[in-house]
A protein has these predicted regions:
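Conserved NTP-donor binding/palm subdomain of two-metal-ion nucleotidyltransferases/polymerases, i.e.
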Residues: 1-11, 17-269
Length: 269
């Protein structure tokens, strides 16, 4: 959709494929010189020097994005088939684009590139899409406000005419500007802290800091289903996975920084 190749860089390529071929996919990617990174319930990450990064998806969203995951669970039924290739309709692509952006926006944040993507796509496809269908589906996804705010802000920011932003638009633009390309660690830590605290509060109306720490060390089934299917199926292995997480924490600077931010938030409670 961009005017020239190379104007839009991506950190990875997301490809949805038939889960029945997961082992076949792994064998093929490894035979092509790729290294298997994170292996989650819904995706496998493959890396190859100098810059190749593929996220091979069994589903488009994990269980921690339950609303989006359920909506896109049977997306294959709505794809356009061309031989072995399956593609979104323009409308369904736009819905996925907004859901994917909202996922990052509500987690660690996302950068100004979101507005540019929105502007470029709509410049090409706005007049040919079925907006009645889009409004109906956006409502199911709970993204009516996010889509409208993104679209209107993109139009205002990227126009060559002087415009005045509303206060909510200014706040959204400030957030996108300060989120870098892939979000900010501080934002991610704060949002994850709130999500975890909500889970703890479901079981205890007055959760203590100790219970929060306990939940972080020994999370619920949803965590293991997303990050370690082996531990999800075999509960006896979970203590060993906890040890692995602690060792990984000690060896990874970004994870240590996130935990320090999380600890500061917990102290304020």
């Amino acid at each position: 959709y961009y005017p020239e190749l190379g104007m839009r860089q991506m950190s990875d390529n997301d490809i949805l494929y038939d889960a029945a071929f997961r082992k076949t996919m792994q064998q093929y990617m490894l035979s092509q010189g790729y290294t298997l990174g994170a292996k989650k319930a819904y995706e496998d990450d493959y890396f190859k020097l100098p810059v190749y990064n593929y996220e091979m998806h069994l589903s488009l969203f994990g269980n921690n994005d339950s609303d989006f995951s359920q909506y896109f669970q049977n997306i294959e039924e709505r794809l356009i088939r061309n031989g072995y290739l399956c593609c979104f309709t323009d409308e369904d692509f736009y819905l996925y684009f907004m859901a994917h952006a909202a996922k990052h926006y509500r987690s660690g944040g996302t950068g100004l590139r979101h507005l540019l993507d929105c502007y470029v796509f709509l410049s090409k496809k706005r007049d040919t899409m079925d907006w009645n269908y889009l409004h109906c589906e956006l409502e199911k996804l709970g993204l009516v406000d996010f889509e409208r705010d993104s679209r209107l802000l993109a139009e205002k920011v990227l126009t060559d005419q002087p415009v005045t932003l509303t206060e909510p638009e200014s706040k959204m633009l400030d957030f996108l500007t300060c989120s870098g390309t892939y979000g900010a660690l501080g934002t991610y830590a704060q949002n994850e802290f709130q999500k975890t605290m909500q889970k703890v509060q479901q079981n205890d109306a007055h959760p203590s800091k100790l219970k929060y720490v306990w939940h972080r060390l020994f999370p619920d089934d949803d965590f293991y289903q997303n990050y370690s299917m082996f531990c999800y199926r075999h509960k006896w292995a979970r203590p060993f996975y906890t040890v692995y997480r602690l060792v990984r924490l000690c060896l990874t600077k970004s994870r240590r920084k996130k935990v320090r931010l999380e600890a500061k938030l917990l102290q304020k409670k």
